[in-house]
């Protein structure tokens, strides 16, 4: 479980929003795409800031489902907090393609409405991601350098 960091008193709304985001990220990690699909609102906006933006929960779930068996995903949530329906995460993500593991930090913003995610916006440093890629490539030759969560 992640460390819970809050700036306002915990309310049922903040607790529900945090749990919805945790359940979504865990389902994504476990390739439980039925749960992923159910977690995303129809009007979802999914954005990797500086890169792509996808509108629609079904479109996003379809994209994620297409990666099943091709791109693995692992997540470690370092901190998570909420203010009402807005949830902020500080985490490390790993993308796994065959033997290649690319691990990097991510800050995510989620908005939850009626238990479903309507906004998923991730911020990450491209240079940090590039370092993760380089480390992953070197680890293919020197396995002891493989990153772990």
Curated annotation (Swiss-Prot):
Coiled coil: none
Keyword Cell inner membrane tagged: no
Gene Ontology cellular component annotations, sorted alphabetically: plasma membrane
Domain of life, per lineage: Bacteria
Transmembrane domains' residue ranges: none
UniProt catalytic activity: an epoxide + H2O = an ethanediol; 5,6alpha-epoxy-5alpha-cholestan-3beta-ol + H2O = 5alpha-cholestane-3beta,5,6beta-triol; 5,6beta-epoxy-5beta-cholestan-3beta-ol + H2O = 5alpha-cholestane-3beta,5,6beta-triol
Pfam families the record matches: LEH
Keywords, sorted A to Z: Hydrolase
EC number(s) per entry: 3.3.2.10, 3.3.2.11
GO biological process, one term: epoxide metabolic process
Regulation: Is inhibited by the anti-epileptic drug valpromide (Ki value of about 100 uM).
Gene3D superfamilies found in the cross-reference section: 3.10.450.50
GO molecular function: cholesterol-5,6-oxide hydrolase activity; epoxide hydrolase activity
Family: Belongs to the limonene-1,2-epoxide hydrolase family.
Function: Epoxide hydrolase capable of hydrolyzing long or bulky lipophilic epoxides such as 9,10-epoxystearic acid and cholesterol 5,6-oxide in vitro. The physiological substrates have yet to be identified, but could be fatty acid or steroid derivatives.
Assembly with partners or alone: Homodimer. Is also present as monomer in solution.
Name this polypeptide is given: Epoxide hydrolase EphG
Organism name: Mycobacterium tuberculosis (strain ATCC 25618 / H37Rv)
């Amino acid at each position: 479980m992640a460390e819970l960091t809050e700036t306002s008193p915990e309310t049922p709304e903040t607790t529900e929003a945090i749990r919805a985001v945790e359940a979504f990220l865990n389902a994504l990690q476990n390739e439980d795409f039925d749960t992923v699909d159910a977690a995303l609102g129809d009007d979802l906006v999914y954005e990797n800031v500086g890169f792509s933006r996808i509108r629609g929960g079904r479109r996003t779930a379809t994209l994620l489902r297409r990666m099943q068996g091709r791109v693995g995903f692992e997540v470690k949530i370092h901190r998570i907090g909420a203010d009402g329906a807005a949830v902020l995460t500080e985490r490390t993500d790993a993308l796994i393609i065959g033997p290649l593991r690319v691990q990097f930090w991510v800050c995510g913003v989620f908005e939850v409405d009626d238990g479903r995610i309507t906004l998923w916006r991730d911020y990450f440093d491209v240079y940090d991601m590039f370092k993760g890629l380089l480390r992953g490539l070197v680890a293919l030759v020197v396995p002891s350098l493989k990153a772990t969560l």
